[in-house]
Amino acid sequence: MAENADLVEWPKKDKRRFLHVVYRVGDLDRTIQFYTECFGMKVLRKRDVPEEKYSNAFLGFGPETSNFVVELTYNYGVSSYDIGTGFGHFAISTQDVSKMVEAVRAKGGNVTREPGPVKGGGSVIAFVKDPDGYTFELIQRGPTPEPLCQVMLRVGDLDRAVKFMEKALGMRLLRRIERPEYNTIGMMGYAEEYESIVLELTYNYGVTEYTKGNAYAQIAIGTDDVYKSAEVVKIVNQELGGKITREAGPLPGLGTKIVSFLDPDGWKQVLVDNEDFLKELE
């Protein structure tokens, strides 16, 4: 029992951080061009794996050693995906939303909400879609170390989802936003909201299930001990739901230790060994 109690405390003591979000695109070069020219991201690394028939590109606003980045996956011959109803958006903070919106428009992007103040607040925001139909919220803010600032996913039970992220992943509930007319939002993360990436969990009243599609894949999070972290996830899975989809251990070929699992809403998360991850970047 004491061992279990010690395990349950582990996620809060662990050195956790968001590493990257993985999703699939129909044309890697097209997406890279859009993200670099419209959003100002940089290509950090690329890899092609012909024997598995896929390519990856990692893009972001800073080095992978410190920043959250996107990992784009292109599967040979697959030009489009179903985003589903559960995935919400990514968010980018910028000092000039209007300028970014104009860049998106000039490159043929889809502006779904023109720049303007958020309802009931002072922040200026806009919404745009990339060439694959992924939504990006653009938020006007001062300079920040992490411009790639949100991943929004919809959940069927906010209290359960928050509890899972706290217990299994060691996140903190940074802010809860109640919008009585339509939804409640929980902002989850490892550091303050304006300094780092947050996971925005949205519960729309009365909606308990969403389609996952086949476009969005997973979020990767760093840990100092994959095996210990996996044991905690198993305990929390029993309590709240979800399941391990890949037992803790090294990836063939790479040697990086990971564990992957589904949360109670069916969203996939992957915990990655911090040291192994840094070796991958060398």
UniProtKB/Swiss-Prot annotation:
Stored InterPro entries: Glyas_Bleomycin-R_OHBP_Dase, Glyas_Fos-R_dOase_dom, Glyoxalase_1, Glyoxalase_1_CS, VOC
Entry note: cofactor: Binds 1 zinc ion per subunit.
GO molecular function, one term: lactoylglutathione lyase activity
Record-annotated VOC domain positions: 17-141, 147-274
Entry GO terms, CC: cytoplasm
Residues annotated to bind substrate: R24, N75, H89, L254, G255
Annotated Pfam families: Glyoxalase
Binding site for Zn(2+): H20, E71, H89, E137
Catalytic residue list: E137
Function: Catalyzes the conversion of hemimercaptal, formed from methylglyoxal and glutathione, to S-lactoylglutathione.
Annotated protein name in UniProt: Putative lactoylglutathione lyase
Originating species: Brassica oleracea var. gemmifera
